Amino acid sequence: MPRKGQVERRDVMADPIYNSKLVTRLINRLMLDGKKGTAQQILYKAFEAIAERSGRDAMEVFEEAMNNIMPVLEVKARRVGGANYQVPVEVRPERRTTLALRYLVNYSRLRNEKTMDARLANEIMDAANNTGASVKKREDMHKMAEANKAFAHYRW
């Protein structure tokens, strides 16, 4: 923990093409080894593929997918009297988007399509249709929170 108080959060610049901070954050999550240009190309190709296949605006599909991936509840480990309890807690809005982006990129990387832009496009489209691995991850988190609802009074 820093001694000089709370660290100020840096604001990301909005994406020049889609004019969205969420898109910039997705590009930053996609980026490997500082290669931002490559990450941008992957995302823009994926968005083109989404627009072509769905016949809708890619940003619309992406925002719908994000809403389907964002978790509302999660569990945190809390130690009480020598036992660890999985305590369900509500997820803050900023963390919701962070987790959703993380799940989207991680499960896109695990897919079997040939190129990363195809993987990302398919995962976004699956998420928009409430299917796909990233949506399943969210459902699993909610199931865990529901199963441990009895420990909700240990919340802090």
UniProtKB/Swiss-Prot annotation:
Originating species: Exiguobacterium sibiricum (strain DSM 17290 / CCUG 55495 / CIP 109462 / JCM 13490 / 255-15)
Gene Ontology terms: cellular component: small ribosomal subunit
Subunit structure: Part of the 30S ribosomal subunit. Contacts proteins S9 and S11.
RNA-binding listed as a keyword: yes
PANTHER family (UniProt xref): RIBOSOMAL PROTEIN S7
Transport recorded as keyword: no
CDD domains: uS7_Bacteria (cd14869)
Family: Belongs to the universal ribosomal protein uS7 family.
GO molecular function: rRNA binding; structural constituent of ribosome; tRNA binding
InterPro entries: Ribosomal_uS7, Ribosomal_uS7_bac/org-type, Ribosomal_uS7_CS, Ribosomal_uS7_dom, Ribosomal_uS7_dom_sf
Name by which UniProt lists this protein: Small ribosomal subunit protein uS7
Pfam families (UniProt xref): Ribosomal_S7
Function as written in the Swiss-Prot or TrEMBL entry: One of the primary rRNA binding proteins, it binds directly to 16S rRNA where it nucleates assembly of the head domain of the 30S subunit. Is located at the subunit interface close to the decoding center, probably blocks exit of the E-site tRNA.
PROSITE patterns named among the record's database cross-references: RIBOSOMAL_S7
